[in-house]
Structures are given as C-alpha cells and as structure tokens.
Amino acid sequence: MADSAPRLAALDDSIVSRLPSYSQSLFAAKTAHELSFSAIAEHLGRSEVAVAALFYGQATASPEDITKLAELLSLPEAQLRKDLGTGFPDRGRSGPMPPVEPLIYRLYEVVQNYGYAFKSVINEKFGDGIMSAICFDTKVEKETVEGADWVVITLRGKWLPFTRF
C-alpha cells in the first residue's frame, strides 16, 4: 500500500551555497514539522509562493511573519529576527542561468518561446511600459481537465507606463 504521508518540497543540495545560511534551518524545521508551504502560508496569512520565497531568501519577512514562523517551526525567534529581519533579499542568484532544474527550465522556456508574444499583446492592451515584478503577486493552482492535471500559474503585476522625459 502506498504511503499516505504528504510529499514536501525540500532544499536541493545543489543550490545551498547560493542561498542564505538560514534557508537550511527553515527547510529542516519545515521537514521536521511535516509542513507544506500551503500550511505555513495559511498560518502566516500569505501566499504559498511568498512563503517559499522567504525560505529561499528571495523575499522580505515582516516582524509578524518572523514571530509566526518561530512559533510554527519551533525556531528561536531572536535568531530568526536576526536572520530574516535585517538586510535585504539578494534576489535572482539562487540558481544558474540558464536554469538546469527541469521544472524551472520549463518556466524559462515559456518566456523564451512566448516572451515576445506576451510583450506584443500586453503592449497592445496597455501601451508602452512594463509589468512590475515589485508591485506583484502570483499564485499556483491545480486544475483537472478531462482527468489530466494542469498547472495554472497566475502572474499579476502593476502596469508601469514608460514616462516621457
């Protein structure tokens, strides 16, 4: 009979050297408590992608996030506050470019294959500008269509028109 325990995302050893040292502690506690990013997100009142980004050092934790993480993961709050509450995220350096991890590469491939198509359609709808990745949110959902599972990724960014100067 198959094991019914949930499968949880763990830290990939091949990227540990590119991540903040606290990432290992967060992932170890997540595994020890058998928590999914979804469960942690519910406790923090944030999206699961935002929580995963915290674990990888790609997002900023609020003081409330730190308190709730310390409580949920049984980690010393003072240490978490020191690790997560000071400095700024070092975004964009957690993996090689182009990506070598297959799922991450597929996302990269989507941009390679459809980037200019997305840009053209967006420009026609909004004009000359960019979609913010700062004033931004995202979510991942699972959808089943005719018995097949589909990944639905929503990217929602504020429109920033280029200004004339």
Swiss-Prot record:
The protein's Enzyme Commission number: 4.2.1.104
Enzymatic reactions: cyanate + hydrogencarbonate + 3 H(+) = NH4(+) + 2 CO2
Catalytic machinery residues: R106, E109, S132
Molecular function terms from GO: cyanate hydratase activity; DNA binding
Source organism superkingdom: Eukaryota
Enzymatic class: lyase
Keywords: Lyase
Biological process terms in GO annotation: cyanate metabolic process
Record's keyword annotation contains Lyase: yes
Keyword Cytoplasm part of the UniProt annotation: no
Main function: Catalyzes the reaction of cyanate with bicarbonate to produce ammonia and carbon dioxide.
Family of this protein: Belongs to the cyanase family.
HAMAP family: Cyanate_hydrat
Name of the protein this chain belongs to: Cyanate hydratase
The organism's taxonomic lineage, starting at the top: Eukaryota, Fungi, Dikarya, Ascomycota, Pezizomycotina
